[in-house]
Amino acid sequence: MNEQLDVLKLVAERLQHAAIAYMISGAIALHYYAQPRQTRAIDIVVALRREDAERVVNLFAEDFYIDADAVRNAIAQLGMFNIIHYDHVLKVDFIVRKETPYRQEEFARRMAVEIHGVTMWLVTAEDLLLSKLVWAAERHSEMQLQDVRNLMRAVADLDWA
């Protein structure tokens, strides 16, 4: 987890320094709220526009494998691209935020939290739960359903409204 934490901190600090809005999601967010699940990937939702592509590539090119075409395509299609840290061989998946009303609200609700001395933006527990239910339905994933159960057990004050 130390290498993963080092890469997470590096990515979060670079995004913040570049004023690129983001939120951590997926298994890393689950780890913040509930029982951790083994994963080597870091999932980060980012708010990007076409003109941000070159800046994103330049932010990470020194320490990460990054494909400029994949970044441009992901932004254009509101899809996903990844970067891989050269030394730690850890993958960071960047999910370009969708422009649906729910995804915009989800992003607006993100929370600033401190993780090992660094302030980072994190999806709320409620939005993580909803996303995992969607992923479970789309992929017929028992792992996602187990994550939902773990989250519901661990977070006593979920807002059901």
Annotate each PLM feature.
Residues 1-161:
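Compositionally biased terminal segments of proteins
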